[in-house]
Structure formats: structure tokens, C-alpha cells
A protein has these predicted regions:
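Pre-active-site segment of Zn-dependent metallo-hydrolases
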Residues: 41-80, 84-91, 99, 110, ...
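Active-site-proximal loop/helix segments of hydrolase catalytic cores
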Residues: 159-228
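Beta-strand-turn-beta hairpins that frame and shape the catalytic cleft
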Residues: 24-27, 41-47, 129-140, 177-184, ...
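Zn-dependent metallo-beta-lactamase
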Residues: 2-46, 53-55, 142, 146, ...
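Active-site neighborhood of phospho(di)ester-bond hydrolases with catalytic His/Asp-centered motifs
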Residues: 48-50, 70-78, 98-101, 184-188, ...
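Active-site environment of divalent metal-dependent phosphoester hydrolases
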Residues: 55-56, 80-84, 104-107, 126-130, ...
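Extracytoplasmic
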Residues: 32-34, 42, 68, 125, ...
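Binuclear metal-ion centers of metallo-dependent hydrolases, dominated by the metallo-beta-lactamase
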Residues: 97, 109-133, 224, 228-277
Length: 277
């Protein structure tokens, strides 16, 4: 009788999601290069962040063709290396656009993002939280110290009568909380800023995806200070080495973290790699 009861209880635990750790699905992270990531959640949902999949450092030149399910596309700001192929992917997959309202509006009106896939349900602003039920996740928009402009596809020099770049609202970073999985902080393009100290007041970040390239964003030394303030369990460098101006390196970042006593928090990925979280 006892053996029979144990079997029944064990089956019930698995059915109701209370089974052993090995029965749970992990969160999968894929890095395409620059600031572009794919996140597959334990529920089977798929998020893309800043989907420049054709970034030169991505070894897989068929990444867009290989995409299957995509539920949401998160874009941090309007620069081309972050919008990437978002519109093409949205038309292919039906993915909804998560972005600040100003950026969301201009991606629809200027770039042709499908209207029904970019609504108030997934548009927001700094401090707001957006539920992503298809992916079993929620995302909070946080500040990023950067710019955000959309360049129309037909842009020419303003002096020649062409369109100028269009302001696209405030740039943001995203804190992504995954049901049954980790909390990630994608910084977007940013410098270090004082309000990063507020992030650990509200979130326990498991993995911080931090830009380190410099010139347009914080460099390795400034990024190390950002990590000290955010207090993630782990940090992965991104947005470096895509072209010459992004000269910051993971080795420099590791050294700067080590000087602050937190060098063991850094993990590395190469473009095209996957990691279970």
C-alpha cells in the first residue's frame, strides 16, 4: 500500500508542476551578437530583444529563416542596430512589439510594423510593467542614458530635401521576470547612472546583460560600476567588437570587475551560442 501511495503522490507532483528539479524546463538564452538575444521561457514562449540578427558577428547567416515561434519583440530604442529586422520578423511570426510608446508609434507609422501587433497592451514607459502572458513573463521598463531616433528607410541628407531622423521617445532597458525562471536585466545602450542603485531595491537580478563597448555606451570600467550597483548574480558583456568604435573587451571588463571584487560574476558567450539559465 505504501509503495502504491508513493507512486500516486509522485505522479501528482509531476502533473501539478511540483516535481523534482530535473522535471522542470530551463530558460534558454541565445546571443546573436551586439544587443540581440532570443529567450525561450520554461512555458515555451519566445522573446527577441533588439533583433539585429544580421549583425556581422553572427556566424549563422540564416538566423531569420530559422526562426520559428516568436511571441514578443522587445526593442530598447530606435537605432538601426537595435531595431534590426524587427518588422520583417513581426510579419513572419506575428510577434507583438514591446517598446516605449513613442518608439512603438514610430515603428508602426515610419517603418511599417503591423498595427495589430503593436498596441497599448505592449507599449509602456519607464517604471511601468507589461505582462507577457504568451511567454509566461513580465517586463519592467527602466531608464537608459542614451538617445533614440528612427532613421526612415528613404532618408537622404536634410540639405538635399530628404527626411531627418525622427525622435522616438525615451530609450529604455528591460528587467524581464520569467515565471519559473530567472530575472534578467538587459541594459539597452546606456551609460552608468545613479538610478541603477534602485534596481536591486525592486528586483533580484540573476543575469545582467551589460553593454561594454564604449564610445556610444559605457565602457568596461563604467560598466563594472554599474554591475556593482545593480548587484546581479551574474553579468554577461554585450555590445562590443561589432565594429572598431566599440573597442571595449571582455578581458578589460573582467579586470575592472576584479578590481571591485566581483570578477567571479562575469560569464561569457560568443555570438551564435546558447546557454541554459
Amino acid at each position: 500500500m505504501n509503495q502504491w501511495l508513493c507512486k500516486v503522490l509522485g505522479l501528482a507532483l509531476l502533473v501539478f508542476g511540483l516535481g523534482p528539479v530535473w522535471a522542470q524546463k530551463s530558460t534558454q538564452l541565445h546571443w546573436y551578437g551586439q544587443a540581440a538575444f532570443k529567450i525561450e521561457t520554461p512555458s515555451g514562449g519566445v522573446l527577441l530583444i533588439d533583433p539585429w540578427l544580421n549583425v556581422p558577428t553572427n556566424p549563422d547567416k540564416q538566423s531569420i529563416d530559422k526562426l520559428g515561434r516568436v511571441d514578443y519583440i522587445l526593442v530598447t530604442h530606435g537605432h538601426r542596430d537595435h531595431i534590426g529586422e524587427a518588422v520583417e520578423i513581426a510579419k513572419k511570426t506575428g510577434a507583438e512589439l514591446v517598446a516605449p510608446y513613442g518608439l512603438q508609434f514610430n515603428m508602426k507609422s515610419v517603418l511599417g510594423y503591423p498595427e495589430k501587433q503593436a498596441t497599448g497592451a505592449t507599449g509602456g514607459n519607464i517604471g511601468g510593467q507589461i505582462m507577457l502572458p504568451k511567454a509566461g513573463a513580465k517586463v519592467t521598463l527602466v531608464h537608459a542614458a542614451h538617445g533614440s531616433d528612427i532613421t526612415p528607410p528613404t532618408i537622404a541628407e536634410p540639405a538635399a530635401g530628404g527626411l531627418a531622423a525622427i525622435h522616438a521617445g525615451n530609450p529604455v532597458g528591460y528587467v524581464i521576470q520569467i515565471d519559473g525562471g530567472p530575472t534578467l536585466y538587459h541594459t539597452g545602450d546606456t551609460d552608468v547612472y545613479q538610478d541603477m542603485k534602485l534596481i536591486p531595491e525592486f528586483f533580484k537580478v540573476d543575469l545582467m546583460l551589460a553593454c561594454i563597448g564604449g564610445h556610444f555606451t559605457m565602457d568596461p570600467k563604467r560598466a563594472a560600476l554599474a554591475v556593482e550597483w545593480v548587484q546581479p548574480k551574474q553579468v554577461m558583456p554585450m555590445h562590443f567588437g561589432t565594429y572598431g568604435l566599440l573597442a571595449g573587451t571582455p578581458a578589460q571588463f573582467k579586470a575592472a570587475l576584479t578590481q571591485r571584487g566581483i570578477g567571479d560574476r562575469m560569464i561569457e558567450m560568443k555570438p551564435g551560442e546558447d546557454r541554459a539559465l
